[in-house]
C-alpha cells in the first residue's frame, strides 16, 4: 500500500475534493499533524525535531509527503526527506478575492483559496 503523508496544520478531512483526489493519486492519505514550533527554540532544537519526524515519516515509506508550516522546520525536514529520496510537495492554491461594500459603506474583501496542484520542492 502506498501512502501520501499530509504533514501540515490542515487535516485532509477538511480538504476540497480536488486536493483529496490529487493526494490519493500518490496513495492513501495519512495525516501527521505539523508540530508547534516555539519561537524561542534555536536552530539546533528545530533541526532535532525535523530529524525525529523524518525518522517517523521514513518508517512509513511514503510515496510523497506534503510539508507546509513554520519555515525553518519545513526547510530542514524537506532537505532530510529529499536526501532520502522521498517526493516532498507543497500545495499550490489560487486566491480568489471578492470585494463588496457593506452596510456602512466600508469595502470588505473576502478571500477564498482554491487548490490547483501540488508542486515538488
Describe the function of each predicted region.
Residues 1-62, 76-79, 83-121:
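Long, low-complexity, Lys/Arg-enriched
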Residues 63-69:
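Short glycine-rich phosphate-binding loop at a beta-alpha junction
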Residues 72:
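Conserved histidine-centered catalytic loops in small-molecule metabolism enzymes
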Amino acid at each position: 500500500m502506498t501512502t501520501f503523508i499530509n504533514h501540515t496544520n490542515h487535516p485532509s478531512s477538511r480538504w476540497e475534493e480536488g486536493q483529496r483526489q490529487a493526494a490519493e493519486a500518490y496513495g492513501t492519505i495519512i495525516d501527521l499533524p505539523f508540530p508547534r514550533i516555539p519561537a524561542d527554540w534555536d536552530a539546533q532544537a528545530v533541526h532535532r525535531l525535523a530529524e525525529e519526524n523524518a525518522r517517523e515519516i521514513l518508517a512509513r515509506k511514503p510515496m510523497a509527503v506534503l510539508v507546509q508550516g513554520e519555515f525553518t522546520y519545513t526547510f530542514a525536514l524537506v532537505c532530510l526527506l529529499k536526501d532520502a529520496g522521498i517526493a516532498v510537495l507543497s500545495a499550490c492554491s489560487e486566491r480568489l478575492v471578492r470585494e463588496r461594500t457593506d452596510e456602512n459603506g466600508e469595502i470588505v474583501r473576502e478571500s477564498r483559496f482554491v487548490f490547483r496542484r501540488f508542486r515538488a520542492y
